[in-house]
């Protein structure tokens, strides 16, 4: 219980100052305009949490996927392990880590990275495995080595599935990062809990999280379209 209360005790509860709309706990555009600056730092913290966690998670899952691709027997245990981690309630995982690594940005990152693995690893290994054997045989017939086939044939063909997993992992991380305040990492979740009963505050902080998830998703989608020009050509 003390681990749960510590992050809450560190929150600087915001006082509400405004007219009738604020006192009646309505949706107050004027209050929002006057207080937008208080959301800048939490938003930047949220972006940092998401970007670092997804980047680290991608690097780890990429290495695991390459390892499992060459040693197929590893696929099942790695998939099972990532699935088990994802079943752990997010708040519980943050609180489990706090006594070990303390209240910090990196405590939140460890938890968020762990949650990305179930999407990233599964999509990466599926993308590599689903490359048709006849395509790889044709590449070998042209004189390409196994390493060249991996990077010139298998990896490009796996890109759509890999980036699909990245989109899901990123959106999920934006969502889970709202709970990073339990690890003392701030973010939009901390802003929400500063005044969770005030509708305007919750709407703005929650809306920013949704907007952030949409922007990440659109950015990855644009990258996917640039990396898979053959799909655009087929669509036209």
Where do the PLM segments sit?
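Cytoplasmic-entry segments and transmembrane alpha-helices of multi-pass inner-membrane transporters
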Residues: 64-97, 122-126, 130
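Loop-to-helix entry region at the N-terminal start of transmembrane alpha-helices
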Residues: 38-49, 95-119, 201-205, 209
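Short cytosolic juxtamembrane segments of multi-pass membrane proteins
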Residues: 224-236
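Transmembrane alpha-helices
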Residues: 51, 114, 146-179, 210-211
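Membrane-embedded alpha-helices of multi-pass transport/permease systems
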Residues: 59-64, 107-136, 159, 163-174, ...
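Periplasmic/extracellular loop-to-transmembrane helix junction in inner-membrane transport proteins
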Residues: 4-53
């Amino acid at each position: 219980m003390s681990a749960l209360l510590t992050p809450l005790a560190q929150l600087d509860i915001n006082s509400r100052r405004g007219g009738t709309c604020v006192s009646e706990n309505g949706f107050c555009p004027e209050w929002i305009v006057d207080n937008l600056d208080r959301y800048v730092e939490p938003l930047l913290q949220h972006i940092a949490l998401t970007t670092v966690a997804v980047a680290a998670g991608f690097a780890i899952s990429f290495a695991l996927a390459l390892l499992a691709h060459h040693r197929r027997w590893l696929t099942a245990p790695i998939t099972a392990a990532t699935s088990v981690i994802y079943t752990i309630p997010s708040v519980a995982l943050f609180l489990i880590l706090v006594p070990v690594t303390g209240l910090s940005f990196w405590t939140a990152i460890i938890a968020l990275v762990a949650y990305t693995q179930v999407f990233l690893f599964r999509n990466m290994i599926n993308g590599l495995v689903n490359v048709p054997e006849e395509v790889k045989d044709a590449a070998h017939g042209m004189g390409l080595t196994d390493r060249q086939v991996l990077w010139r044939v298998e990896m490009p063909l796996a890109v759509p599935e890999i980036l699909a997993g990245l989109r899901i992992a990123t959106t999920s991380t934006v969502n889970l990062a709202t709970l990073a305040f339990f690890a003392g990492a701030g973010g939009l979740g901390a802003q929400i809990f500063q005044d969770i009963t005030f509708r305007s505050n919750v709407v703005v902080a929650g809306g920013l999280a949704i907007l952030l998830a949409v922007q990440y998703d659109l950015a990855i989608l644009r990258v996917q379209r640039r990396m898979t020009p053959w799909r655009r050509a087929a669509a036209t």
